[in-house]
């Protein structure tokens, strides 16, 4: 079992690395569990990022994360590319167990485990990620200028993605497995009014086609079983997100969608000394810049909490021998 640290950060990405930077600069010596596979977060799977302030010519997602990581490390953050398999956040001293079974202890924990896009679950889906398949229109839409694109989904996110993509695309086809949309009336009307957007109803994706890049989709009508081909070079999947909160169920309060609940505008959770930031608490914006902002907030919230603990320790009278 390790010595008690000031703060452990579970997760990386813009939120985790920003929290690490701020706590490190406050001389709190944070320990960061970046994740064995997901170190760097969702931006590790993107290409050029053009909407993060400070990079007028854009920056590749992995490079941005490497820069953030190096900056946090420069100020003394300890970064471990490992996963956390168990936590106990109930006591004054929190415990975090890594994949080797080592138990790490800390006075405060910042949760930045993020969320993951729901996938179609098709064999070629991951292989063509970044090669025509995407889960983020605002991240990748510009790269599909004058191309035929498909958007999968029927909710507000799918309509937002389709409307945004229509600025660049030659055409946008929304594929939905029902004959009505779940999106709000305003979002539906906006999509229906867009001359570049068309709909394929009662259908699902049966196959993502292509070798080195996306070549098209094979669709299946869910009522008749009939198969059809949809020739597109861009596929945007917008069927929702799943927050990575499985580890915290039964300890931290979650909202009905599974996202971590915080006492906004702060980042405090229902447990003293535990803070949440980034996409794990955000099912509205899900942008790198907003994640970084809440990572900063979590660090700033943790600092006075830890300072108060330190003051309490100093105030305790020394025990005299009898």
From Swiss-Prot:
Belongs to the class-II pyridine nucleotide-disulfide oxidoreductase family. NADP(+) binds at residues 176, 182, 239, 259, 286. It is found in: Cytoplasm. It comes from Streptomyces coelicolor (strain ATCC BAA-471 / A3(2) / M145). GO terms for molecular function: thioredoxin-disulfide reductase (NADPH) activity. Disulfide bonds join 136-139. Its main location: cytoplasm. InterPro entries: FAD/NAD-bd_sf (IPR036188), FAD/NAD-binding_dom (IPR023753), Ferredoxin-NADP_redctase_2 (IPR050097), Pyr_nucl-diS_OxRdtase_2_AS (IPR008255), Thioredox_Rdtase (IPR005982). It catalyses: [thioredoxin]-dithiol + NADP(+) = [thioredoxin]-disulfide + NADPH + H(+). Pfam families: Pyr_redox_2 (PF07992). This is Thioredoxin reductase. Induction: Expressed from 2 promoters, 1 of which (trxBp1) is under control of SigR, and further transiently induced (about 50-fold) by the thiol-oxidizing agent diamide. Part of the trxB-trxA operon. One of its GO terms (cellular component) is cytoplasm. GO terms for biological process: cell redox homeostasis; removal of superoxide radicals. Its EC number is 1.8.1.9. Keywords: Cytoplasm, Disulfide bond, FAD, Flavoprotein, NADP, Oxidoreductase, Redox-active center. FAD binds at residues 12-15, 34-42, 51, 84, 279, 286-289. SUPFAM superfamilies: FAD/NAD(P)-binding domain. Its cofactor is FAD. It comes from the Bacteria. Binds 1 FAD per subunit. PROSITE patterns: PYRIDINE_REDOX_2. Homodimer. The active site is a redox-active disulfide bond.
């Amino acid at each position: 079992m390790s010595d008690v640290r000031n703060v452990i950060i579970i997760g990386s990405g813009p939120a985790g690395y920003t929290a690490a930077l701020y706590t490190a600069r406050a001389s709190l010596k944070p320990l960061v569990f970046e994740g064995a596979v997901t170190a760097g977060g969702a931006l590790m799977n993107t290409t050029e990022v053009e909407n993060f302030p400070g990079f007028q010519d854009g920056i590749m997602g992995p490079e941005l994360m490497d820069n953030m990581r190096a900056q946090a490390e420069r100020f003394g953050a300890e970064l471990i590319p490992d996963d956390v398999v168990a936590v106990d956040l109930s006591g004054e001293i929190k415990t975090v167990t890594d994949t080797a079974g080592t138990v790490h202890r800390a006075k405060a924990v910042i949760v930045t485990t993020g969320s993951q896009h729901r996938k179609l679950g098709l064999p070629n889906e991951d292989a063509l990620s970044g090669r025509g398949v995407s889960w983020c229109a605002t991240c990748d839409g510009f790269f599909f200028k004058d191309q035929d694109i498909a958007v999968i989904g029927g909710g507000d996110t799918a309509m937002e993605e389709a409307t945004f993509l229509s600025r660049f695309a030659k055409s946008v086809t929304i594929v939905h497995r029902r004959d009505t949309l779940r999106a709000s009336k305003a979002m539906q009307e906006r999509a229906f009014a867009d001359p570049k957007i068309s709909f394929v109803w009662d259908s699902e994706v049966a196959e993502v086609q292509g070798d080195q890049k996306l070549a098209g989709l094979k669709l299946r009508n869910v009522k008749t079983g009939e198969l059809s081909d949809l020739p597109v070079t861009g596929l945007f999947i917008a069927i929702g997100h799943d927050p990575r909160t499985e580890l915290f169920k039964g300890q931290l309060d979650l909202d009905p969608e599974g996202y971590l609940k915080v006492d906004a505008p702060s980042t405090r959770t229902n447990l003293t000394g535990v803070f949440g930031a980034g996409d794990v608490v955000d099912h509205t914006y899900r942008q790198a810049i907003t994640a970084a902002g809440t990572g900063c907030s979590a660090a700033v919230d943790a600092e006075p909490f830890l300072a108060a603990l330190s003051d309490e320790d100093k105030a305790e009278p020394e025990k005299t021998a009898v």
